[in-house]
A protein has these predicted regions:
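Conserved class I S-adenosyl-L-methionine
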Residues: 1-38, 49-53, 57, 70-79
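Conserved Class I S-adenosyl-L-methionine
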Residues: 2-6, 20-21, 47-49, 171-265
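A structural alpha-helix within SAM-dependent methyltransferase catalytic domains
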Residues: 29, 52-55, 118-125, 151
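Class I SAM-dependent methyltransferase SAM/SAH-binding core
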Residues: 39-95, 118-119
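A short acidic, Gly/Pro-enriched loop at the edge of an enzyme's catalytic core
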Residues: 93-104
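A short SAM/SAH-binding and catalytic strip from SAM-dependent methyltransferases
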Residues: 103-117, 140
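Conserved catalytic/acceptor-binding region of the Class I
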Residues: 118-119, 129-203
């Protein structure tokens, strides 16, 4: 079942999102817990941030990684020589594994893009052994100030951008309690939810601007089609918002929040 995530290659993904999932992986696993042995699954592995974090646990026997985007899978394969890791293309809504095959299943920053998150979470439970833990995390819509700064500025100046590469509203599961409800409805027990906070640090305005315009999604086509004067106006407004009244370009940091949920099969 296709996702509604528009991928534009592994390099663009790393610049726009992969670097942040690397920071989120460790606190996510601290909350989720990692089994003392056995097989685990990274469902929706992207370019491998969580997979490689799991590989830091030497007691794990095998680490499966799956993503809908073949180029992300290829990027992960190129990043590791760990013989425990097997990466393949596949659909989180139809996991290509047997029932009760895994000792842990994880999904980091994936389910808000899946067309049927309820089905995906049921699949996560299906492939878990009884008593094992599944966990997932999604960004909080209200807890992403750098992204709100960007998209709110776009919509203030270019309202017709809605639906043309610009989110028309918050994505599903990005409010408190929504992901928890999906886990509970899938039959998980002992469901727990928390908020994880990481810094999103940018070296300068270009480091902030370019990945958001030319990273994942379809906004770049809309932006490039604008008349030059409107492109310049939007970029200038975005730069002013990024600088925040400080005339000097340079590093800026934004604390960003994700909701994480875990449950027992």
């Amino acid at each position: 079942m296709p996702s509604n995530f528009v991928a534009k290659g592994a390099k663009a993904y790393e610049a726009s999102m992969g670097r942040w999932s690397q920071r989120l992986a460790a606190p996510f696993l601290n909350f989720s817990g990692v089994p003392s042995r056995g097989r685990v699954l990274d469902a929706g592995c992207g370019t491998g941030s969580l997979t490689l974090a799991l590989a830091a646990f030497p007691e794990l026997d095998a680490i499966e990684a799956l993503d809908f985007e073949e180029n992300f899978v290829a990027a992960l394969r190129s990043r590791t020589t760990d013989v425990r890791i097997r990466a393949q293309q596949g659909d989180v809504c139809a996991l290509p594994y047997d029932n009760q095959e895994f000792d842990g299943v994880y999904s980091l920053l994936v389910l808000q893009f899946v067309s049927d998150a309820h089905r995906a979470v049921r699949e996560m439970r299906r492939v878990l052994r009884p008593g094992a833990i599944a966990a997932a995390a999604v960004w909080s819509y209200g807890g992403m100030p750098s992204w709100r700064l960007f998209w709110d500025t776009v919509l203030a100046l270019e309202p017709e951008a809605t639906g043309r590469g610009v989110p028309s509203g918050r994505r599903p599961l990005t409010a408190e309690g929504e992901l928890r409800e999906v886990f509970e409805s899938a039959g998980f027990t002992g469901v727990a939810e928390t908020m994880l906070t990481i810094p999103m640090n940018y070296a300068n305005f270009e480091d902030f601007w370019h990945p958001k315009v030319y990273g994942q999604g379809t906004f770049a086509a809309f932006f490039d089609a604008l008349p030059t004067v409107r492109r310049d106006r939007l970029r200038d407004a975005m730069r002013a918002a990024y600088l925040g009244g400080d005339g000097d370009d340079g590093p800026r940091g934004f604390s960003s929040v994700a909701f994480a949920v875990r449950g027992m099969a």
